[in-house]
Amino acid sequence: KMIDAIIKRDEELKTRPISAIVVAPGCLPKAFPKEDGASMVRVEMAYGKCYAALALGRDSSLVKVRHEESPSFTSFLIKTSGGKLFPEGGGMQIRDSDGEVIGAIGVTGDTETVDQELALHGIRSAGLKTDADFEGKGRKFAIRRTKAEDGR
């Protein structure tokens, strides 16, 4: 359902051809279509965004900010993950109504902003939640933001 909604929205926005992937906890792929015309390694890039989101417990766009602030930190994580972690926006954790992380979604193919919008659209279309829905709801759901992420 999430992937279908993403592809439909992608067609409405007339974006570049995309790849999207939904993974279970542990980053086990569940669905990963690649639109005709999407360039090589798009599925791997979308997977890397999911990996980043699950590995650090935050949207991959925030992992990108962390990478810009401290390249040595994320370089270590990229190396430790065997190159699986991709610190670019478009990967989001998927949460159920209780806030439990039940997987992640990654989208790639257009701008970071569009990829992020499509990932969010997919999650919302399935009636599921994101990290943002649980901000300020206690330590279990806490996402500690850096100064740059807070806009300070």
Please provide the spans of the model-predicted regions.
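Flexible, solvent-exposed loop/hinge segments and secondary-structure transition points
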Residues: 1-152
